[in-house]
């Protein structure tokens, strides 16, 4: 086991703070409509230019091992916020930095970190509850366009994303792809997505995006587990003879069968991707039938008289393309008969109407959306690969932000919602001592996102924060125009989910950092010089 080196007490916390500062200072220049870009060096190919907080954060690793621990904690804030809400990563990082600064100042003054942590948690709960109360549901396509425009910094992209959600609905699937032209356009295709990823990373075809993409595959839908290669081999030979590729949906694919698929993929002999079937029990059977209907195939199962080692190509479904990530599968343009798909949707709607269970109705609604909603592909074009990647980052963030807004509603944007929601902390939540100090830490920290939106636009941040704090909720500073306006009427809105996730995740990591007393890292190996 490698030797370790340690840091303790104040020295340890200051190292963590320096690491958080380094990462946050790198990320926060991107905040707001006038935020700047960060250029990321790549070992191969052109550099990446982006204003996406989590993309920048993932690239930061520091040489000092203690400071690097702080940077990695701050990175976790951005990553977690991106996973939950898909946007707001820069805001989350700025909030984490502010909470750490104010918290460590309080600890240095003699406050107990555990008491501060409790106060911070209670304050965040109160602010999130207030955010929920001042939020409103998204009502119109123009609201969706406003959210997407704020996130992408582009009105044309905002309108395109709003149109995409209009087509597929809130449960529909929207993906971002490359275009062969310079423009950005919308392509609506019927399709289905479910939350199961590839069974082996060796199946990946696009290493940059960690996706397995197969064109025009045969689709095997199997109700059981596939372990033996002897069962799969007869069908595999028929697919290879037809010069096709194979996509497998089954309860599981493991053992000899999985190994053979992977080896053939690595050798370039035969292209295949396997995923586990979505859901469990009766709902899994129903969803396999949905996939079969969409792709024009049949579910291979003993109860319907179909055995894997005896079936031919006629029971396999087809699709134009299947895209599989580590978490999700998207089937695009299934070859099933439209009348059969419509009949299946009508059947599901009847089940929905007759169901008394809220949970069953919710799951049926999801299945209807997956069958009827389809897939919208936003095709992105640009003059160079660098510009293309930057544009794709912005559009992917904007799609996530719009979906978050549809799910939980919107609040006034530009950092003002946090400031106005924090008025609930004016009485310190009737807490005392260190918990009261924790509340005051949150009250100060929530001002930082607006401050940096203003600073990045060349305006005095503290002055603007003070003015906005005195305005009524819903009003604030428009960083793009430099005016004080009714933000919602002006289309400056943020998804509630993004705002609350940013605050909650920042507070979670900052609280842990404040209560840290010891750092343990690997001792660097000393170079042995020849004497």
From Swiss-Prot:
It comes from Cutibacterium acnes (strain DSM 16379 / KPA171202) (Propionibacterium acnes). ATP binds at residues 30-33, 87-91, 414, 494. It catalyses: ATP + H2O + a folded polypeptide = ADP + phosphate + an unfolded polypeptide. One of its GO terms (molecular function) is isomerase activity. It is found in: Cytoplasm. The keyword Ribonucleoprotein does not apply. Together with its co-chaperonin GroES, plays an essential role in assisting protein folding. The GroEL-GroES system forms a nano-cage that allows encapsulation of the non-native substrate proteins and provides a physical environment optimized to promote and accelerate protein folding. Keywords: ATP-binding, Chaperone, Cytoplasm, Isomerase, Nucleotide-binding. Belongs to the chaperonin (HSP60) family. It comes from the Bacteria. Forms a cylinder of 14 subunits composed of two heptameric rings stacked back-to-back. Interacts with the co-chaperonin GroES. GO terms for cellular component: cytoplasm. GO terms for biological process: protein refolding. Its EC number is 5.6.1.7. InterPro entries: Chaperonin_Cpn60_CS (IPR018370), Cpn60/GroEL (IPR001844), Cpn60/GroEL/TCP-1 (IPR002423), GroEL-like_apical_dom_sf (IPR027409), GROEL-like_equatorial_sf (IPR027413), TCP-1-like_intermed_sf (IPR027410). It holds the Pfam family Cpn60_TCP1. This is Chaperonin GroEL 2.
